[in-house]
Amino acid sequence: MSHNAPLVLMILDGWGYNENDRYNAIAKANTPQWDEWWQTCPHILLKASGLPVGLPDEQMGNSEVGHMHIGAGRVIQQDFTRINEAINNGKFAKNAVFHEVIDQLKKTEKSLHIMGLLSPGGVHSHEQHLFALLALCNQKKFRSVHLHLFLDGRDTPPQSALDSLKCLNEELAKHPVATINSICGRYYAMDRDKRWQRVEPVYNLLTQGKSERQFPDAETAIHFYYKNKISDEFVPPTLIGKEHSIQDGDAVLFFNFRADRARQLTSTFLDPSFKGFERKTLPKLSYFVSMTQYDKNLFTTTAFPPVPLNNTLGEVLSSHGLSQLRIAETEKYAHVTFFFNGGCESVFTNEERIMVPSPQVATYDLQPEMSAHELTKTLIAAINSQDYHVIICNYANADMVGHTGNFEATVQAIECLDQCMQQVWQALKNNGGKLLITADHGNAEEMFSEATNQAHTAHTSEPVPFLYVGGGWHFTHSEGSLIDIAPSLLALLGITPPPEMTGRILLEKNHAHA
């Protein structure tokens, strides 16, 4: 590969492979470029869920986990698995952070406010982690606990909150330490695109008890919203029972383990230079506990601190003096940077980053192309500049539009991506470059669930494609997993993968006399 003929690793977020074309937006879409490649270019399928990506067996993959494994080239035990193991082996109940906080609150006679996504989804949180916290509070005879619950409907069926509430009420019967004081859809509480108009009413509910509506219990509220065609994700910030807002001296515990959708709400409490909206009140908290580290610049007390990773793909490229570009639209920018670098905030030498703003629409089925065309233009300019040896880019459409459950819009998103891929390859071909295409997890290939008779808005456990365009190389294995991508990419560059990368090299140069 010549000095400035770029190698592009294109990650099609949420583009899984499913032989069944029923409810499959990828199969339904008109994709002439993809179809041509699938017939003529070397490709295999990669596992992107469960144990091969450090998750519990059969747990669907997700963007954070996918990008970490693509970048790391080894299996990383995910925070979800770490916390599950800690619960099972008793270490969770002995966690020093939890004990310190509860002991302090008992002394000061203040309250603990536990907030997070009440969901069995296992993508951003898991309700079992909340239940373990309730058991610990009960064990320590601490009963001043208020729950502020965010509803899912995105990594779970759109109307599934009542099932989770039933489980929670069973736990509260066993461990009567807490009351449910508010509910709110994740659309508001877990925004990650600086749409502060969504987050502000959540903050006002938590800190002042302000809410358009108040209900005696969460079930009554949810039935009301369902009757008005509002599913879990979109339930507005709602007060439940008596108002118990967060006061000076209280502690907050955010039990989500995934960082990207926890940062904004956390910053409303902790960021000294916060400018998202005017905060009418700012409680002086004794602690703000986060299950994991959300951001090194947000000084939370972290229950499960990060485990550092060395020699990720970005670091190896940098140490070999190669220039790299990371490019994505807002929705997936953290994934091709922070998560791809193993949860490391720092930027490597010769690593550049470009973020293309995601469109400001309520849901992405209203604009299925999202910012793919703008991203493509920027990507082509970067290829033509010949400034980069490696470009790592993410197209968000299959995932973000797939999450809406809107089949036709997702088909449009896939067709838009096919056009973008064709344009990117044209530019690469003109510059003598190579293209690797893969995905972080599935989504758009399964858009309806016959089991729930609802739109399938969550990720899937299907494998993802791994396709090589550029000639001269072939795959040596019939299947692999996400951890094999980094070693294979390094092989294309003539670099020996470091020993930390336990993934396999799946590509081999064609021999002249084959």
From Swiss-Prot:
It comes from Legionella pneumophila (strain Lens). It is an enzyme of class 5 (isomerase). This is 2,3-bisphosphoglycerate-independent phosphoglycerate mutase. Mn(2+) 1 binds at residues 399, 403, 459. Pathway: Carbohydrate degradation; glycolysis; pyruvate from D-glyceraldehyde 3-phosphate: step 3/5. Keywords: Glycolysis, Isomerase, Manganese, Metal-binding. Its EC number is 5.4.2.12. SUPFAM superfamilies: 2,3-Bisphosphoglycerate-independent phosphoglycerate mutase, substrate-binding domain (SSF64158), Alkaline phosphatase-like (SSF53649). It comes from the Bacteria. Belongs to the BPG-independent phosphoglycerate mutase family. Binds 2 manganese ions per subunit. The keyword Metal-binding applies. Mn(2+) 2 binds at residues 13, 63, 440-441.
